[in-house]
A protein has these predicted regions:
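Short beta-strand/loop segment at the start of cytosolic alpha/beta domains
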Residues: 1-15
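Amphipathic alpha-helical interaction surfaces in cytosolic regulatory modules
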Residues: 22-32, 36-96
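Short acidic-hydrophobic, aromatic-tinged amphipathic segments that line or gate anion-handling sites
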Residues: 98-101
Length: 101
């Protein structure tokens, strides 16, 4: 799993490349902790190159979302594939934050 991070116009654009699984969930948590220390209005995750996410990975996204909201910031996901979109909708994540294909 790789992270590409870019700050632009108050937004934090984060591209994740590779599967988010149990093996790298701790790395994801650490990356998210670092992101929270950056100044931004909205975190935008591009998941175009993420084939799948395990429940551990989803849990890390939820913790990050909770922290982002508590700081008065926003979060959104874009570039999600059809399988992940169905998964996110089935657990109602689309009701927490915007998800775009």
């Amino acid at each position: 799993m790789e992270f590409n991070i870019e700050q632009r116009n108050g937004n934090l654009n984060i591209s994740i490349i590779g599967a988010v699984d149990n093996e790298n969930a701790e790395e994801l948590k650490n990356q998210f902790q670092e992101l929270l220390n950056l100044g931004f209005k909205e975190a935008v995750f591009d998941l175009s190159f993420v084939p799948f996410i395990t429940s551990s990975g989803i849990g890390k996204f939820l913790i990050f979302y909770k922290n982002v909201i508590s700081q008065g910031k926003k979060m959104r996901i874009k570039g999600i594939n059809e399988n992940l979109l169905e998964l996110f909708k089935s657990i109602k994540l689309d009701q927490l934050f915007p998800i775009e294909k």
